Regions:
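Secondary-structure end/capping motifs
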Residues: 141-252
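Short, glycine-/small- and polar/acidic-enriched structural segments
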Residues: 1-73, 78, 95-108, 112-125, ...
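Inter-helical turn/loop segments and adjacent helix faces that build the functional surface
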Residues: 70-75, 139-145
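A bilobed periplasmic-binding-protein/Venus flytrap-type ligand-binding module shared by bacterial periplasmic
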Residues: 2-11, 127-143, 158
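Conserved C-terminal helix/tail region of periplasmic/extracytoplasmic solute-binding proteins
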Residues: 224-305
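Hydrophobic residues within well-ordered alpha-helices
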Residues: 60, 88-90, 230
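Short acidic active-site motifs
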Residues: 84-85, 103
Length: 305
């Protein structure tokens, strides 16, 4: 999700109050603040993400650009580890950030930040974390690789059961993992995370999707979208062979080989149109029909791989 400081949130609300009442919340109010600061000769705002080549960085850039903000020159972008984001916001080192939970929720609970948009609102059911291994390791350890994928699939299915979320929250809130208060961790896992204004939202059951909607399937259309954004922002050359990179890095054939013994349904196609579904839908072109969630982008664009 993207969180801004409480002071910046107040400025956005004053500059463009009408845009702050609609979800998904666009960055037009932020653009108004940025334009005003330019006129007044004030320094650029600073936003943080966790790593240059990350979904968080791409989501932040996408959200900004959709409102006409050029993330390359209208603001300053910096890299900060997730666990240090809240302190950086509190100290004024940064004005906002894009990061995973519980670091958005933590800022809201502390009263220093407001979450303006979630990753799922920028791109519904877009990819987030991946399991990636070296090609040579996969070749040399095929059986282990397949078992690892099966274990991940079964674990994801278990975590996706809302009845197990409290147990997960208790486990990962400990010092050995996230090392954050249970109350800050449990919100996003149960779809009741705090958002703008610090109010409790109870209508985000798909805030975290671990297994349903073919969430573990490595869609090559996801890979191509990621590559398109890397090219867009100069992180990959225009000459990159998108088709080759997508096929060599995202391997649905290996995934399906691994999960087939578990009875997990697999799509028959390796890619799909992204952004064409605003509501739940049924994928029939699969080993058996798969209930799917929305895949729309916040700006209504469609990505054709």
């Amino acid at each position: 999700a993207i969180t801004v400081s409480s002071s910046l949130f107040d400025l956005m609300s004053k500059r463009a109050p009408e845009t702050m009442l609609r979800r998904p919340l666009s960055a037009y109010a932020l653009k108004s603040v940025i334009d005003q600061r330019k006129e007044e000769g004030k320094p650029r705002l600073t936003f943080a993400h966790v790593f240059p080549h990350s979904m968080h960085a791409m989501e932040l850039r996408y959200w900004l650009a959709a409102a006409g903000i050029d993330p390359s020159c209208d603001i300053d972008l910096v890299v900060i580890p997730p666990s240090l984001m809240v302190d950086a916001l509190a100290s004024g080192q940064i004005d906002g950030y894009c990061v995973g939970e519980p670091w958005n929720n933590a800022a809201v609970v502390a009263g220093i930040g407001r979450t303006v948009i979630t990753s799922g609102e920028i791109w519904s059911n877009g990819p987030e974390k991946v399991l990636a291994v070296r090609k040579d390791w996969a070749s040399e350890n095929n059986d282990i690789h397949l078992e690892l994928l099966r274990a991940l699939s079964e674990t994801s299915a278990w975590i996706d059961d809302m009845d197990n979320r409290m147990t997960v929250a208790q486990a990962i809130s400990t010092p050995d993992y996230v090392n954050a208060p249970f109350d800050e961790v449990v919100g996003s896992l149960t779809g009741k995370n705090r958002q703008t204004g610090g109010e409790l939202r109870i209508d985000m059951p798909d805030f975290n999707v671990f297994h349903r909607y073919a969430a573990n399937f490595p869609w090559r259309s996801h890979a191509k979208w990621i590559l398109s954004q890397m090219i867009r922002w100069g992180e990959a050359p225009d000459s990159v062979d998108v088709e080759h990179v997508a096929k060599s890095s995202f391997r649905p054939d290996i995934y399906c080989e691994a999960v087939r013994p578990l009875g997990v349904a697999c799509p028959k196609s390796d890619e799909k149109m992204e952004g064409t579904h605003s509501h739940a839908w049924l994928l029939t072109e699969a080993s058996r029909p798969v209930a799917m969630g929305p895949d729309c982008f916040m700006d209504g664009r469609v990505f054709d791989p």
